[in-house]
A protein has these predicted regions:
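Viral structural modules
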Residues: 1-171
């Protein structure tokens, strides 16, 4: 289906009449990202500590009651990456990294006022991946992450301990 509605010009979709190269003066570069391998991991983690910052509204009255928490973006920040090629398996490597995911926590304070705060979760990954041969253009390792914490308990100060469901795709 075409969304081209003006048929008055010869530079539009449709049958080619005459020289198809007539009028072509633009060059277009299309860049695509090649994915060599991906690893999906789905887990339930208990005892994850969320240290809260950036309260809205500010200065809540403690103790806080946990309502929910979830990741604010699906892109994890990959740090502390270490790639060790496997000598017995060509183009495979052990990939170790820390993936940090920003979180938004919803709570009520001691006065019953609902608020939100920011936190983050750092997850250590240790996986085997297919990686390309060394080249001039380096490859990257990315993480797509979703974290949902349906339950948690107040510890002290601005801190919760939560149980969360994590889905992570390393590619």
């Amino acid at each position: 289906m075409s969304f081209f509605t003006t048929n008055a010009t010869d530079r539009g979709p449709g049958r080619i009449t005459g020289n198809p190269m007539n009028g072509l003066c633009e060059r277009v570069v299309i860049q695509a990202q090649k994915v060599f391998d991906a690893c999906i991991r789905q887990t339930q983690e208990e005892g994850i500590t969320l240290a809260l910052t950036g309260f809205n509204p500010e200065n809540p009255v403690y103790p806080l009651t946990f309502l929910s928490a979830r990741s604010t973006t699906n892109q994890g920040t990959v740090t502390n990456i270490k790639i060790d090629r496997l000598p017995d398996r060509q183009r495979f490597a052990r990939v170790q990294a820390t993936v940090t995911v920003p979180m938004e926590v919803v709570y009520t304070d001691a006065n019953g006022v609902q608020g939100t705060a920011q936190s983050s979760v750092a997850i250590d990954q240790d996986i085997i991946m297919y990686i390309p041969e060394p080249s001039i253009i380096p490859f990257t390792v990315d993480a797509v992450v979703s974290i949902v914490a349906p339950e948690g308990i107040y510890v002290e100060g601005p801190t919760f301990t939560v149980t969360c469901c994590i889905t992570m795709i390393m590619k």
